[in-house]
Curated annotation (Swiss-Prot):
Component of the outer core of AMPAR complex. AMPAR complex consists of an inner core made of 4 pore-forming GluA/GRIA proteins (GRIA1, GRIA2, GRIA3 and GRIA4) and 4 major auxiliary subunits arranged in a twofold symmetry. One of the two pairs of distinct binding sites is occupied either by CNIH2, CNIH3 or CACNG2, CACNG3. The other harbors CACNG2, CACNG3, CACNG4, CACNG8 or GSG1L. This inner core of AMPAR complex is complemented by outer core constituents binding directly to the GluA/GRIA proteins at sites distinct from the interaction sites of the inner core constituents. The chain crosses the membrane at residues 271-291. Keywords: Cell membrane, Disease variant, Epilepsy, Membrane, Signal, Synapse, Transmembrane, Transmembrane helix. Residues 119-234 form the DOMON domain. Important modulator of glutamate signaling pathway. Expressed in adult and fetal brain. Very weak expression in medulla, spinal cord and in adult ovary. Its main location: membrane. GO terms for molecular function: dynein intermediate chain binding; protein-containing complex binding. GO terms for biological process: regulation of AMPA glutamate receptor clustering; regulation of glutamate receptor signaling pathway; regulation of postsynaptic membrane neurotransmitter receptor levels; regulation of synaptic transmission, glutamatergic. Residues 29-61 are annotated as: Disordered. InterPro entries: DOMON_domain, FRRS1L. This is DOMON domain-containing protein FRRS1L. It comes from Homo sapiens. It is linked to Developmental and epileptic encephalopathy 37: A form of epileptic encephalopathy, a heterogeneous group of severe early-onset epilepsies characterized by refractory seizures, neurodevelopmental impairment, and poor prognosis. Development is normal prior to seizure onset, after which cognitive and motor delays become apparent. DEE37 is an autosomal recessive, severe form manifesting in the first years of life. Affected individuals show hyperkinetic movement disorder with choreoathetosis, spasticity, rigidity, intellectual disability, absent speech, and impaired volitional movements.
């Protein structure tokens, strides 16, 4: 009679040991986040280094979290297509009128006592190294500009304008007046440009070199010029005729090396301040006091 094959207890013991230790070995794999002290954490640090790792937030669902974060960084257009959000923009630094006549020159046009936020038109200038920094602001939703002229009339003038476009941005553009028409010049001397449209006002700030290579469309600011002040509406980012028929201008040529704070009353506030009106008031008063013959 044949005898059954003899079983070796050592083989069964080895199989039993493998079954018992297999799950633990898999759980302790160094490639897994649940590894023991000899493994590496999610930041590549040894698991023995406790403390800092515990503060790292863990995603319950990596796909869901990524999708949520990705959607938060995007917005949908009216057609439903996603676009990247606009980059953050530093807030526009408020124009300081307290420095007028001290560390910068200023021109104010409008109501007596007005400032950069309430004047019909405001301009400041100051030297910064080899540049002149200009600040412009006007009560308009279109454009505000300053022209540098050899006289007080438009024509043959170098003009810097801040234009509010249809995208809500304020761009600094360079023009040259040909008669009553402003021709945009591609060569723009402006640098460090910034602008904002708030409270129905266009406000901007930019720098421009004092000395420039000889060019009929760009004047040297180290020379003195009459300053022409203008503002008006814009259509699709293009400037149109200024708001008033006779834009104000500086009474005399302006030197960028001399800081003054000059106020010019607008038409609504200069009725009784012009020499003619004052003379008329004196004549009427004298007539009333003397009486009629």
């Amino acid at each position: 009679m044949a005898r059954p094959p003899r079983q070796h207890p050592g083989v069964w013991a080895s199989l039993l040991l493998l079954l018992l230790t297999g799950p633990a070995a898999c759980a302790a794999s160094p490639a897994d986040d649940g590894a023991g002290p000899g493994g590496r954490g999610p930041r590549g640090r040894a698991r023995g280094d406790t403390g800092a790792d515990e503060a790292v937030p863990r995603h319950d669902s990596s796909y869901g979290t990524f999708a949520g974060e990705f959607y938060d960084l995007r917005y949908l257009s009216e057609e439903g297509y996603p676009f990247p959000t606009a980059p953050p923009v530093d807030p526009f630094a408020k124009i300081k009128v307290d420095d007028c006549g001290k560390t910068k020159g200023c021109f104010r046009y409008g109501k007596p006592g007005c400032n950069a936020e309430t004047c019909d038109y405001f301009l400041s200038y100051r030297m910064i190294g080899a540049d002149v920094e200009f600040e412009l602001s006007a009560d308009t939703d279109g454009w505000v500009a300053v022209g540098f002229s050899s006289d007080k009339k438009m024509g043959g003038d170098d003009v810097m304008a801040c234009v509010h476009d249809d995208n809500g941005r304020v761009r600094i553009q360079h023009f040259y007046n040909v008669g009553q028409w402003a021709k945009e010049i591609q060569r723009n001397p402006a640098r460090d440009e910034e602008g904002v449209f708030e409270n129905n006002r266009v406000t901007c700030r930019f720098k421009r070199p004092v000395n420039v290579p000889r060019d009929e469309t760009i004047v040297d600011l180290h020379l003195s010029w009459y300053y022409l002040f203008a503002w008006g509406p814009a259509i699709q980012g293009s400037i149109t005729r200024h708001d008033i028929d006779s834009p104000p201008a500086s009474e005399r040529v302006v030197s960028i090396y001399k800081y003054e704070d000059i106020f010019m009353p607008s038409a609504a506030y200069q009725t009784f301040s012009s020499p003619f009106c004052l003379l008329l008031i004196v004549a009427l008063t004298f007539y009333l006091l003397m009486g009629t013959p």
